[in-house]
């Protein structure tokens, strides 16, 4: 069969199939003729095509390739999968052990050439060295020292009672010394010693608030007679704002209940009577001042007979210069 401008060839096979080939058909549409001499049975299956060539790329080979060059440490979490999608096997060793680090520990067990050189300590200049002062030996402390046996007490004085008498009666209950610390309350009458040389006393009557009260009463033993020595000093404020004070030389009558804080402790009389033990002193000797023969030995113990030092309070009322002898004055403040 022929057509205009085209050539058609028809081939009939033994199985009755027809193959049509056109001369002007593109090469992509050409079909290969079936071989008639093929001995392949019709029900046979064609062999599968050969698999495509695969790349023999493994993580170990990649690590071997990178081992020759320097390894760049990356930040962040390591990859879980490689470029081909296969799981990456992590090394059991930590990252810190991958690259050896320089040790800063000095090994003293090696030879002397490899030992670290220690720089000697710089000597401190003598100008920066503080001198050490030695404390003077004051003798041995007895187990019954004043600091260990100081006991505070509160004495309550009722209205109308004498504060001085109440404190002295409390001190006579034992052989302890009495130290008056403070007091609060109001007094109605007080007798104070004059600060001038006349030796007189002044008595103030009225209502005075106690600002401060202090004093000491020490036990003394003179010719087998035990007594108390000491005194008190007081500062008072009047209702009009004036302040009077001085050594208590007589009554100190309470106008309201007064609380007095005192402390009891062991006196130093028994400790001074003991013979002092010789002690070695390593202090520099200083030249002694010449002393007269009538000066008593410093080891002689004298009982305390004088009271507290006279205060420098000045009386609120001027004293009359005509009185040249010891006189007592009774002054009432309203």
Swiss-Prot record:
Keyword Magnesium attached: no
SUPFAM superfamilies: AF0104/ALDC/Ptd012-like
UniProt feature, compositional bias: Polar residues: 90-103, 306-319
GO molecular-function term, one example from the UniProt record: minor groove of adenine-thymine-rich DNA binding
Gene3D superfamilies: Hypothetical protein, similar to alpha- acetolactate decarboxylase, domain 2
Region described as Disordered: spans on this chain: 1-103, 109-128, 306-334
Chain ranges of the PPC domain: 147-287
Alphabetical UniProt keywords: DNA-binding, Nucleus, Transcription, Transcription regulation
Biased composition (Basic residues): 71-80
Tagged with keyword 4Fe-4S: no
Span of the annotated motif Bipartite nuclear localization signal: 72-80
Major location category of this protein: nucleus
Known DNA-binding region: 72-84
GO-annotated cellular components: nucleus
Stored CDD domains: DUF296
Start-end of Low complexity biased regions: 1-21
Bias (Pro residues): 44-54
Cell compartments where the protein resides: Nucleus
Described purpose of this protein according to its UniProt entry: Transcription factor that specifically binds AT-rich DNA sequences related to the nuclear matrix attachment regions (MARs).
Domain notes: The PPC domain mediates interactions between AHL proteins.
PANTHER family: AT-HOOK MOTIF NUCLEAR-LOCALIZED PROTEIN 2, AT-HOOK MOTIF NUCLEAR-LOCALIZED PROTEIN 9
Protein's recorded name: AT-hook motif nuclear-localized protein 2
Name of the gene this protein is made from: AHL2
């Amino acid at each position: 069969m022929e057509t205009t401008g085209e050539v058609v060839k028809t081939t009939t096979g033994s199985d009755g199939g027809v193959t049509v080939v056109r001369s002007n058909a593109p090469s992509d549409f050409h079909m290969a003729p079936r071989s008639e001499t093929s001995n392949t049975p019709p029900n046979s299956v064609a062999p599968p095509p050969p698999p495509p060539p695969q790349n023999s790329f493994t993580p170990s080979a990649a690590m071997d390739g990178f081992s020759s060059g320097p390894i760049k440490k990356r930040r962040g979490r390591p990859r879980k999968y490689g470029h081909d999608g296969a799981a990456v096997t992590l090394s059991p060793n930590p990252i810190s052990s991958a690259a050896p680090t320089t040790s800063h520990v000095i090994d003293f067990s090696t030879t002397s050439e490899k030992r670290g050189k220690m720089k000697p300590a710089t000597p401190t200049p003598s100008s920066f060295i503080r001198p050490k002062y030695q404390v003077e030996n004051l003798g041995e402390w007895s187990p019954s020292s004043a600091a260990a046996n100081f006991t505070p007490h509160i004495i309550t004085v009722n209205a109308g009672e004498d504060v001085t008498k109440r404190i002295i009666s409390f001190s006579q209950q034992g052989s302890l010394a009495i130290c008056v610390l403070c007091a609060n309350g109001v007094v109605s009458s007080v007798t104070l010693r004059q600060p001038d040389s006349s030796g007189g006393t002044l008595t103030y009557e009225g209502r005075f608030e106690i600002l401060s009260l202090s004093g000491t009463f020490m036990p003394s033993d003179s010719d087998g007679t035990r007594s108390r020595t000491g005194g008190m000093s007081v500062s008072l404020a009047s209702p009009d704002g004036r302040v009077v004070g001085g050594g208590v030389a007589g009554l100190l009558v309470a106008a309201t209940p007064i609380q007095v804080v005192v402390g009891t402790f062991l006196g130093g009389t028994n400790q001074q009577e003991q013979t002092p033990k010789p002690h070695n002193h390593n202090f520099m000797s200083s030249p002694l001042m010449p002393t007269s023969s009538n000066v008593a030995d410093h080891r002689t113990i004298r009982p305390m007979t004088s009271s507290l030092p006279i205060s420098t309070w000045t009386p609120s009322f001027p004293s009359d210069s005509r009185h040249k002898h010891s006189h007592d004055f009774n002054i009432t403040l309203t």
